[in-house]
Regions:
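OB-fold/S1-family single-stranded nucleic acid-binding modules
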Residues: 66-102, 156, 160-173
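C-terminal functional regions that serve as terminal interaction/effector modules
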Residues: 39, 130-133, 141, 148-149, ...
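Generic structural motif
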Residues: 15-18, 39-41, 68-70, 108, ...
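A compositionally biased, intrinsically disordered/low-complexity signal enriched
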Residues: 12, 45, 57-67, 97, ...
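Acidic (E/D-rich), amphipathic helical modules within compact regulatory domains
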Residues: 30-91
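Short nucleic-acid-contacting surface segments enriched for D/E, G, S/T with interspersed K/R
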Residues: 49-66, 143-161
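Structural detector for short beta-strands of small beta-barrel domains
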Residues: 1-28, 84-123
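OB-fold (S1/OB) nucleic-acid-binding surfaces
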Residues: 24-45, 115-142
Length: 173
């Protein structure tokens, strides 16, 4: 999975645990789950390693996780603006698989008219978002009528609801 600003992404976290997933005949594990705890945080991010990017031998290590959010809903934040990660209401034991992410747009890498049919005109966007504990990527289609001026720009505050998070890389420190 390619993201245009991968080198900018990073959340310092501890790789707490792994759940390897089912073994396939080719010897790889199907959809392994990893659990990352951002430094100083109490929330545990449950992430499915869809692309087998994380070395399971890194369990227990602190490192830089490069994460990209996709799917879910995106909207402009209302005052007061906030940065952070909120677990879904059904999260148990502090583990969240589809959190709400609150952040400020750092950089817009891609902004183009979308070919996806939604209920209103939309824009495809790839951007970096400061969520307080670091920068994550966002890749999605935005309904342009939901945003002032019909788009997002650096400095915009966003709320990502029930988003899926993919991991591009985990680099131990």
């Amino acid at each position: 999975m390619h993201f245009p600003r991968t080198e900018q992404l990073g959340i310092i976290c501890r790789f707490e645990q792994q759940v390897p997933g089912q073994l396939h005949p080719d010897g790889r594990r199907y959809l392994p789950q990893i659990f990352l705890r951002p430094t100083g945080g109490s929330i545990l991010l449950g992430i499915v390693d869809r692309h087998h990017r994380v070395a399971l031998s890194d369990e227990g290590k602190v490192g830089r996780a490069r994460l990209v959010a996709s799917l879910g809903s995106v909207r402009s934040q209302r005052l007061p603006y906030r940065l952070g990660i909120l677990p879904e209401s059904a999260a148990q034991s502090g583990i969240t698989f589809m959190p709400t992410l609150l952040g400020q747009v750092h950089e817009v890498a891609t902004l183009e008219a979308s070919s996806v049919l939604l209920s209103a005109p939309s824009t495809y966007v790839e951007l970096t978002l400061n969520i307080g504990v670091g920068l994550i990527g966002l890749r999605t289609n935005l309904v342009t009528t939901d945003f002032p001026g019909g788009s997002v720009a650096p400095g915009s505050f966003l709320e990502l609801l029930r988003t899926r998070i993919d991991i591009l890389e985990f680099v131990p420190l």
